[in-house]
Amino acid sequence: MKLKNRQPKLNADLRELVRTNAECYGDKVLYIYKENGEEKTVTYNENWNRMNALGTAFSRIGLMGETVAVIGEAHPMYMTAYYAATCGGGVIVPMDHDLSDDQLAEFMALAEAKAIVYTKGFNHRLTALADKMPGCRLFIPIQPDEEEAAHPLTQTMNELIAMGQAALDAGDRTYLDVELDRNKMCTLLFTSGTTGTAKGVMLSHHNLASATNAACLSMLQFNDKSRFVDALPMHHSYEVTCGHFAISNLGAEMFINDGLKNVSRNLAKYKPNSEMLVPLFVETMYKRIWNEIDKKGMRQKVETAIKASNALRKVGIDMRSKFFAQITNAFGGQLKVIVCGGAPLSPQLIRDFDAFGITILEGYGITECAPLVAVNRMGKGRLHSVGTAVEQCQVRIDTSENDRQEEDIAEYGYPTGEICVQGENVMLGYYRNEEATKAVFTEDGWFRTGDIGYMDKDGYIYITGRKKNLIILSNGKNVYPEEIEEYLSRIPDIQESVVLGRKNAQGEVVITALIYADPTRFEGKEKAEIFETIKAQITDLNKTLPAFKQIREIEIRDTEFEKTTSRKIKRFKVM
C-alpha cells in the first residue's frame, strides 16, 4: 500500500492501524530510543512483527483475550504490549508509574489483570508485591537483570517474543486470525483515586480508532517527514492516542525520551520539527528562554526584534529564522509546531512563540473521549480558544444550569455552560460503575465533561477556567478533588475543606487545600499556630499519596464555606 496524497488513512481498529502502518511505511524508522547507553531503532515492520509474536505467545500461555496491565517509563516494548493485548481481543490497563504499592495492588485487583508488563524501574518492586496481587499470574519484565529474569513468576518480554515467533514460523495463526469485537472494551484507564473513588474509563477499538482518525484529520501539518521527541507519560491517553497512534498513522519518526532531565538535551540533538506537549513543558521552555535573555541583558533588543519581525511578516517577509535562531537552536533549530493540551496557556506565551517561529496549537481533550475533543487547526487558530470540534464528534454547550447568562454574555459575548460531547470517541462507560456512568450522560446521550465554557458563532470552543470538579495540573495530570477532600476529612482538626488547583509563585498549577479548622479544637489559638498544626498533619498525609496528588499549598480560613440549602459547599464561590 502506498499513500497517493496527503490525506491520512483511516482505520477501524488498532490491528488495522499497526498493519497498514507496516504496509505503508515498511522499514522506515518509527522509534529511536536508548537502552543501556546504546541507541536503537524500531521500524514500522518490526513494530507489526513484534506485536504478532507477543500476541501469539499470549495465545500459547493463556493470556490472549485476558486483561494485561502495563507500567513504566517510555519504551517501544510498552506499545508492543499495548497492541498485543488489545489486538488479541483482550484488555490493556496502562498504570500510572507514580502509584504507591498499595494503589498498584488495588488497581490490579479491580481490573482483574492476569499479567503485568513493566520497564526497568519496576524490576523487583512488582515481584515483591506478588502476594498482594494473587490474581496476577505472570510478571513480564522488558529489561530484566539476571535476578529478575530468574524469578519463578517472571517470563521476560524477549523470551515471549521468541516463543511467539517460533510458533508463527511453525504456522500458528491463532492470534493472527482472531476476530475483534470493535465495540468491546479493549483499554481500561484509571483516571484517579483508590478503589473507593477511582473511575475506570472503558474504551473500545472503535473509540480509539475514531479518536486517532480525528486526530490525523485535524493535524494535516504532520506527515511522514515529521520528527518528534516524545516526552509525556506512557499511561496518559493524550500520549497514546495522539503521540503514538496518530503519529505512527502519519508515518512520522519518534525519539523516545530517556528521562525528564534529558528533554532539553534530546531536543537539541534529535532536532524535532513537531511536538505534542502538556503546558508544563511549554511554560518551562518559555521561562528558560526569557531567563537566558534577561541574563544577557538582551530583553529590549529581543522585544525590538519581535516588533520588527512582526512588521516585516505583514508585508510577506519572514525573517524569524534569522532573527531568533539563537533561541530556537535550543530546541534543535527545526521546531515549527507544538500541539498542546491539558491546561490553558497564556496568550502572550503563544504570541511570543509565534514571533520566534514556533506555532502553538491549543487543544482540548478528556480521557472519557479517548481523549481528543477539539483543537486549533494550522493557520486557523484563535487565541484563548481550544479550537473547533474534531471529526468523529460534536460539541454543545449546556446552559440549562447557568443562572448568570446575562453576565456571561456581557463578559464573553456568549453564555457559558457545561461542555457536552457526543460521538464515536466517547467512552463505553465507567468500569463496574453504572451509577457514575449514568450521572455523566444526558437523557439524549451526550457526555457531560464537567468543564465549563462557551462556543462562538464559528464553532470555536473556549474554556472559561471554571471547572466543575476536575483539577488539571500544569503537567497534564488530572486529580479529582473529592478524593483528597476525603483524606482531609479523616483529620479531626479539620472541619471543612475544599481542594482545587491554583497557580503557585512559579506559575504552576498545584494542589491547594483551603481549610476551615474545627474551632472547638483550637480555642484561644492564634492563626499561625493553627496553620503549623494543620501543615504538619497534611505533611503526614502527603507521605501516603503519589507526588502529583500531594497538597502543595495550604490556606486557613476564618469562616465556614458558603453552602447550599442541602449543606453542600458552593465550590464555585471559592474557585
Region annotations inferred by a language model:
Residues C87-M163, K503, P519:
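Structural core segment of the AMP-binding/adenylate-forming
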Residues L99, I116, G423, L428-G429, ...:
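AMP-binding/adenylate-forming catalytic core of the ANL superfamily
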Residues A209-R227, M234-F324, Q334:
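Conserved AMP-binding/adenylation subdomain of ANL enzymes
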Residues V498-G501, T512, T539-M575:
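Conserved C-terminal "lid"/linker of ANL adenylate-forming enzymes
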